[in-house]
Amino acid sequence: IVSKGIYRPIFIEFGNIHFFELDLQGRHKGFKGLLSLFKELKKLRPTHIADLHSVLRSNVLYFLFKINFFKIKRLSKQRGERKKLFRSKNKIFKPLTPSQFRYCEVFNRLGFNLDLTSHEFPGPLNIETETQLKINQMPTNMKWIGIAPFASFNGKIYPLDLMQKLVSFLQRDHQIFLFGQGEYEVSKLEVWTNAYQNVFGSYNLGSFESELEIISNLDLMISMDSANGHLAANYNIPVVSLWGLTHPFGGFAPFLSKTKNMFISDREKYPKIPTSAYGKKIPKGYEEVMRTIDYNEVIVRCLKVLEKPKHHQSL
């Protein structure tokens, strides 16, 4: 696996994976850095290479491996279909192939027969002592809800005043874990952790490994169209997702997520949705599309999901 070091903990469960850490700010920076990266990876003598990113940087590597006769396949971005889905006029509103299945296609073209219908989820991670010490004052009889209220772009973020109503209600009978990072997000989340008894800021855990321990033991994750929903889905945690300027038809819904767990902004009122794959493009008048998602309906759905037996590890 070639990726940023922060993602290493995701692959800890696999004993036969070698994680190669990118140094994009150092020896792998820029075009010269890509050449260095190619030389380092070439020394590993891979028999098969899967480019699951298909962006400019990985395209350069694809070309270098290709002209050196390595067996390499890359991800299809479905650019033609995406353009038709995201354009504002004459939009063709039909679902693209989910990203997880497009990843499988890459491996299948390399000769590996992957079938997600027989997928096995990993079990919850063991909550290590260091993490337990930080959460040991929590009630043991409550179900755990993760809430990740932020996303990479504003077009995917549920209004914080409405999200606070969700937090306020759900924390009465459930333990809430808030997920966010960076000074701005933490400053917003700390308002809620200080205001409500059963709300904990997961940024206080101090490491991504500890956050994964909590995520894998949740009973429910509430997320935007963002990474935390995918991380929870990796552990078969139910995900209730809220969608703004993006849409599940774009192919980026959490793995095996149920349609009834996805709350979509009103397309009758805002027909340009989805405006892009990542929610960066905000058309004029579309700044508040997510206010069309009724937080009461989200609460009702969350309570329905939480009727299932408690999932998390007993502390």
Predicted features along the sequence, with ranges:
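Catalytic machinery of carbohydrate-active enzymes
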Residues: 1-315
